[in-house]
Amino acid sequence: MLTIVAIALFGALGCLARYLLAGWVYAFVGRGFPYGTLTVNVVGAFLIGLIMEFSLRTTLIPQELRIGLTIGFLGGLTTFSTFSYETFRLLEDGEFITAAVNVLASVLVCLACTWLGIMTARHL
């Protein structure tokens, strides 16, 4: 039961964090490219690498907290569905290069940030 509560509470916090962070990014750089979605996904990629690697190397993060942080918070923070929708809209609008850049940037930068999170955790 504690795990379910952790997922729900951290999930709510992750959703709020996504809304606030993406909104701040869009307010700062505009909406010509899906920077807000890219930002939350990149942050989430780094954090999942950090949290998972750290939890594999130590017992400092209880299982309920790890699940709450990864499935709950990061599940609420990151968004593959919004990434998919925004990319589809770019394609529909004929913005083929922008759509391709979005896909490549999302995949490559997120993978790099996951690796960076893992490397960071290994040096803690």
Swiss-Prot record:
Keywords of this entry: Cell inner membrane, Cell membrane, Ion channel, Ion transport, Membrane, Metal-binding, Sodium, Transmembrane, Transmembrane helix, Transport
Top-level taxon of origin: Bacteria
BP GO terms, sorted: cellular detoxification of fluoride
Record-level GO cellular component terms: plasma membrane
Transmembrane annotation, as ranges: 4-24, 32-52, 67-87, 96-116
Keyword Membrane: yes
Membrane protein topology class: Multi-pass membrane protein
Subcellular location: Cell inner membrane
InterPro entries hit by this protein: FluC
Catalyzed reactions per annotation: fluoride(in) = fluoride(out)
GO molecular function, one term: fluoride channel activity
Record's keyword annotation contains Ion transport: yes
Predominant location: membrane
Residues binding Na(+), per UniProt: 75, 78
Record comment: activity regulation: Na(+) is not transported, but it plays an essential structural role and its presence is essential for fluoride channel function.
Job description of the protein: Fluoride-specific ion channel. Important for reducing fluoride concentration in the cell, thus reducing its toxicity.
Family under the similarity heading: Belongs to the fluoride channel Fluc/FEX (TC 1.A.43) family.
Protein known as: Fluoride-specific ion channel FluC
Gene assigned in the entry: fluC
